[in-house]
Structures are given as structure tokens and as C-alpha cells.
Amino acid sequence: MYRRWHGEFQLLIDIKTEGASTYRELDLRLRRYRHLFTTYAHGKVRRSAVTAVISGDRAARVPMEAQRVRRAFYDGRLADLGSAAPASFIPLISDNWSLNFTWQGVGPIPPAERQKLRGIVSTAHKRGQRVRFWATPDLAGPQREAVWGELLAAGVDHLNTDDLAGLQRFLDARGR
């Protein structure tokens, strides 16, 4: 982190192996750098420079929920939106765009899908959660830009892409 930078950095860790055992090992490693990581302890969140959010294999949830002190948070799904799990455990709601929306950027977004998207974002934000979708169109072109535009207009917090330069051009063109 930069010496005079006071923002937050989200480290999204995508577990591709068995979640519970991988998370337990990761937790041991995060403890070595406890001064860097946002921490949940006994019902309270203490912010720090880096907030680790665990994504990927869902089995990581069980050991995480059992911890009274942890240096990582859980990446929820749309099914978690409105659940009893608080934002102090699930600060991020992520899901597969293609499984939840039929619109892929061709023509205007159907009004019902725009309303659904905005409802998801509104509900999450009221709960103190951020929103991200993966599996959005990611080939350069008008379809991708149309989807990104709708995501921004709806207030989605994270745009998921493998084309960082393309995203930067898109955001720069919109003064973001």
C-alpha cells in the first residue's frame, strides 16, 4: 500500500480447491500480516488497508462462520441477499450474470431485467453490501459496453473483466 493512500483495497481470493481446508491454511497465512487486513472480531469490523474476500469453493463458508476472529470475509451469492447473514460476514454479493439475466447487450435491456438489476443493487446497498456479476460479455464491442453501461447506471460496485485496459478506456470515456 502507498504510504499516504487511505483508501481500501479489496483482495478477492478465488478458491479453486476444496474450500474448507484451503481456507484454514489461508487463515494461518493471513494472521502473519494481521496489521494489513480488515478484521472481524467479536461482532465488530476493524477496517485496514486490505479487505480479503473469499470467493470460489462454497465449502469455505463453514469454517469462516465458526470463527469469532477472522481476517477474511465471504463472497455471497444472490441467494444470500436478504438472508440472516450480515454484511460483516458477506460484504460482497456476486453472481453469474448469464444465469440471472437473458440480456447480453444486444438491443435495449428489457425493462423487467433493468428493474430486477436495480432491485438487487438497492437491496444489497441498504444492507451495506457491494455487488458484482461475473460471466458478463467480455469481448470488446458494443454488447460489452452496453452491459457495462447498465451495470454502472444501476450502481453495481465492481465490473468483472479480464480486459483491464478495455475497462479503463470505457471508464475514462465516461469520466469515471
Report each predicted region and the residues it spans.
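Catalytic cores of phosphodiester-bond hydrolases, prominently lipid phosphodiesterases
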Residues: 1-176
